[in-house]
Amino acid sequence: EGNDNYISHFGIGHEAWNFNKNELIDGKVYGYLKADVSSLFSEKHNIFFFSRDSNGDLFFVGYYKDCKYLTEEERIKLKEKMVESGLLDKRINQVYRILKNEDDFSEWSWDDVESEFGFEVSSFKLEVLPENITIFENKIPFTEQDCIEVLEKGWQERYGNYTLIPDLDRFLSKFLMK
């Protein structure tokens, strides 16, 4: 479905839709974030996504520039739009088809998968313009100490596989120059 279709390139994973620029609502991508963090509501944020390999080594996957963390009211409206557009059912069906072939989840029904997406409030909490999404072609290795030096704060995985980037230019120059 085009060069920007993250899912066609990488499959469905924990937050596979975070980088899919083909499935827009009102011209924006809505990314998944596990944490509920009300302190993020009032301003735009730069957020990087990372993963760990089987050895526990860290790798940057990509980032959002100037994304907005949606309030609960905004997420309720988003959920309605996702239902109306058919996008929510499409995503639930993608996950359901994959899980039914996995031994640990083969007993799950479509309704079980649907319940994981939340009922009234969308679990997609980040709003970003497609042009403000970057996914790295090759994952970029880093260490916790690298982040502490650049972010000038202690390392934490408070938000799951994400952290906030106060100074995006400084951050990128440090890690893209490695």
Tell where the protein language model's regions lie, with residue ranges.
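Intrinsically disordered, low-complexity regions
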Residues: 3, 12-14, 28, 32, ...
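Contiguous surface segments at macromolecular interaction interfaces
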Residues: 1-9, 72-178
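Compositionally biased, charged N-terminal/linker segments
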Residues: 1-41, 174
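Aromatic- and glycine-enriched beta-alpha-beta binding-site module
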Residues: 32-74
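Intrinsic-disorder/low-complexity loop/linker signature
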Residues: 22, 27, 56, 137-139
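Short, flexible loop/turn elements at secondary-structure junctions
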Residues: 10-16, 21-23, 51-53, 65-71, ...
